[in-house]
Amino acid sequence: MPFIKAVKSSPYFSRYQTKYRRRREGKTDYYARKRLIAQAKNKYNAPKYRLVVRFSNRFVTCQIVSSRVNGDYVLAHAHSSELPRYGIKWGLANWTAAYATGLLVARRALAKVGLADKYEGVTEPEGEFELTEAIEDGPRPFKVFLDVGLKRTSTGSRVFGAMKGASDGGLFIPHSPNRFPGFDIETEELDDETLRKYIYGGHVAEYMEMLIDDDEERYQKQFSGLIADGIESDQLEDIYAEAYAKIREDPSFQKSGKDAAAFKAESLKYTQRKLTAEERKERFNAKVIEAGRA
C-alpha cells in the first residue's frame, strides 16, 4: 500500500488543544503533580507538603512546599551553596552534598514548626533503613512526600540522597530502601555499609584513590579544590561527620552579606533598558535629521 500523508484538516485545528506551557517546555510533569497535591476532601486547612529536590550543574536545591489555589507556598528552603558554612566546600552537587542539603532543610523546617526537639531523627547515620516514627503522647511527625520533578528515579540517584538526608533529619517521608545505593535486587536486601559509604563521601574517596594510581593528571584537575586545601581522601569522612553535627547545631539561614543594591547595579549594567515612547520618537527624529544632513 503506498504511503498516504496525513492531512490535517480544518476540523483538526479547530479541535486542537495546546498543552500547559510548563508541559510544552518540559518543566512540569502534571500527571505526577496532580497526584502529589491531591488533598483528602474531608481535611480542611491541612496542607499536603512535599519535599521538592532539584539539581543544577553545580548545586542542589531542597524545599518543603505546599500547594494552594493561588500558588505554591515554600515552608523551608535549603541550597547546597550554604554548605561551605558547615565545612563542605567542594562537590556541592554530588550524592553526599544532596544528603547534607536534605538534612539541612529537614532541621530548618522542623525548627520552624517547633518539632526540632521532639524529632531529632538519626543523629549518627550508619546506613540503616529507618522511618521516623510517632512519639507517644506527642505530636505526629511532620509528613512530606518526595517530589522528584522530571528527574529519572534510577537506583542510587542523588535525589534519594536528599530524601535520605531529610528522613534522617526527622521528617516522615514514606519510602522503601529499594532505590538506595547498595540495594540488591536479587536478595531484596540493603547493604548498610554501601549506603553508609555514600553518606560520608566514601565513594568520592575511593575515586580519588583510583585516580591517584591510574590518572594523576585528571586527579589534579578534578580535585584541584581539595588539593589546594590540603585535603586527602582519608579525611573526607571526618569532614562530613563534623558538617552534619554543625547542621544540627545551627540550621538557621544566614544572609550572604552581599550588598544587594551594589549587586543589582552590577547586574543591570549589562542589561539594555527598554526605551519609552518619547525616547523612541526623539531617536527617530535625530536619525531623520542626521540623514538629511548627509
Curated annotation (Swiss-Prot):
InterPro entries: Rbsml_uL18_euk (IPR005485), Ribosomal_uL18_C_euk (IPR025607). It is found in: Cytoplasm; Nucleus. GO terms for biological process: cytoplasmic translation; ribosomal large subunit assembly. Transmembrane segments: none annotated. Gene3D superfamilies: 3.30.420.100. GO terms for cellular component: cytosol; cytosolic large ribosomal subunit; nucleus. Keywords: Cytoplasm, Nucleus, Ribonucleoprotein, Ribosomal protein, RNA-binding, rRNA-binding. It comes from the Eukaryota. There are 2 genes for uL18 in S.pombe. Belongs to the universal ribosomal protein uL18 family. Component of the ribosome, a large ribonucleoprotein complex responsible for the synthesis of proteins in the cell. The small ribosomal subunit (SSU) binds messenger RNAs (mRNAs) and translates the encoded message by selecting cognate aminoacyl-transfer RNA (tRNA) molecules. The large subunit (LSU) contains the ribosomal catalytic site termed the peptidyl transferase center (PTC), which catalyzes the formation of peptide bonds, thereby polymerizing the amino acids delivered by tRNAs into a polypeptide chain. HAMAP family: Ribosomal_uL18_A. Component of the large ribosomal subunit (LSU). Mature yeast ribosomes consist of a small (40S) and a large (60S) subunit. The 40S small subunit contains 1 molecule of ribosomal RNA (18S rRNA) and 33 different proteins (encoded by 57 genes). The large 60S subunit contains 3 rRNA molecules (25S, 5.8S and 5S rRNA) and 46 different proteins (encoded by 81 genes). Component of a hexameric 5S RNP precursor complex, composed of 5S RNA, rrs1, rpf2, rpl5a/rpl5b, rpl11a/rpl11b and syo1; this complex acts as a precursor for ribosome assembly. This is Large ribosomal subunit protein uL18B. The lineage of its organism: Eukaryota, Fungi, Dikarya, Ascomycota, Taphrinomycotina.
